[in-house]
């Protein structure tokens, strides 16, 4: 196609565009309310797109959750929950009788700290009660991009006193700073892991969404740590590498807890999980 024909096509497109703009202007002039409706719909579409991009897509959300479908995975016998101040005051007597798919609760993961200064307001109570009621308990630290890895690690160690029979310490990491390279971010995460590992002589558990791990914690060194995968409302784990725990829903219901609670399963037997605990690890890797 030569330049003359291209020029004619461009001129024709311009004339058609002007006609369309003129027709749209006439329509809006005759019906001013249409402008409000058009603008409102555009803003709503933008809002939905932004919400999906930043909150839905990264976590693998499934719309069935809106209907309260906890979607219990089949074939697993060791069930547990993770809790924080969001669950409020827990009635542990009632919780002790709670069952998931006919199986009793075996373990409880408890939020302890966040960043370099925050302590969950229900941590001490939940941590003591979990041991008192016979659950295998664990404590997790919620990673913050606003504090150094070293300060966060020592904040966790100064707050949490894990004992023999407890699960290894847990690092919950879900966000990478936008202004930091993947290599620097991985170095920070490893700093936290190494400091805490030196204290307890066990490898901490890493909790995160599987897409986040594949994108930001994909270095082989992270495969040496037990993985607690967050992957909601699916029938099976899509992550191909080994994992220990699976948080499969955030809309679980149990007696003794008001509102929703996260449900988890352990990938193995109760005996296997006991071997994972502090003071009982003998070649579990």
Question: What are these regions, as identified by a protein language model?
Answer:
Residues 168-240:
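Catalytic domains of cell-wall/extracellular-matrix polysaccharide-remodeling enzymes
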Residues 117, 146, 213, 236, ...:
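Flexible, glycine-rich phosphate/dinucleotide-binding loops
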Residues 17-28, 51, 55-66:
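Short helical patches
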Residues 66-87, 218, 222-285:
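Functionally critical loop-and-helix segments that line ligand-binding/catalytic clefts
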Residues 33-56:
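Hydrophobic membrane-insertion alpha-helices, especially the h-region
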Residues 59-68, 72-91, 96-193, 197-199:
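Substrate-binding cleft of extracellular glycoside hydrolase catalytic domains
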Residues 1-32:
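N-terminal Lys/Arg-rich, disordered targeting/topogenic segments
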Residues 152-163, 182-195, 212-221, 246-262:
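Short secondary-structure transition/capping segments
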């Amino acid at each position: 196609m030569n330049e003359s024909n291209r020029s004619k096509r461009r001129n024709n497109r311009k004339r058609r565009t002007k006609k369309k703009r003129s027709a749209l202007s006439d329509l809006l002039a005759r019906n001013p309310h249409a402008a409000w409706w058009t603008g409102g719909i555009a803003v709503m579409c933008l809002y939905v797109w932004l919400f999906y991009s930043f909150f839905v897509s990264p976590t693998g959300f499934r719309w069935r959750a809106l209907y309260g479908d906890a979607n219990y995975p089949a074939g697993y016998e060791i069930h547990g929950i993770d809790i924080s101040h969001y669950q409020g005051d827990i009635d542990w007597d009632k919780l002790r009788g709670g069952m998931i798919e006919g199986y009793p609760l075996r373990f409880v993961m408890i939020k302890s700290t966040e960043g370099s200064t925050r302590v969950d307001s229900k941590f001490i109570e939940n941590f003591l009660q979990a041991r008192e009621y016979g659950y295998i308990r664990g404590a997790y630290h919620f990673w913050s991009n606003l504090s150094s890895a070293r300060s966060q690690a020592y904040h966790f160690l100064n707050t949490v006193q894990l004992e023999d029979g407890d699960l290894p310490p847990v690092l919950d990491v879900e966000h990478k700073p936008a202004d930091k390279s993947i290599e620097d971010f991985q170095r920070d995460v490893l700093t936290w892991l190494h400091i805490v590992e030196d204290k307890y002589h066990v490898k901490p558990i890493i909790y995160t969404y599987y897409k986040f791990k594949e994108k930001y914690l994909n270095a082989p060194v992270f495969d040496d740590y037990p993985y607690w995968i967050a992957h909601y409302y699916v029938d099976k784990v899509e992550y191909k590498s080994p994992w220990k725990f699976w948080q499969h829903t955030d809309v679980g219901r149990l007696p003794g807890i008001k509102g929703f609670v996260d449900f988890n399963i352990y990938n193995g037997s109760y005996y296997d999980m006991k071997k994972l605990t502090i003071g009982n690890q003998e070649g579990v890797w």
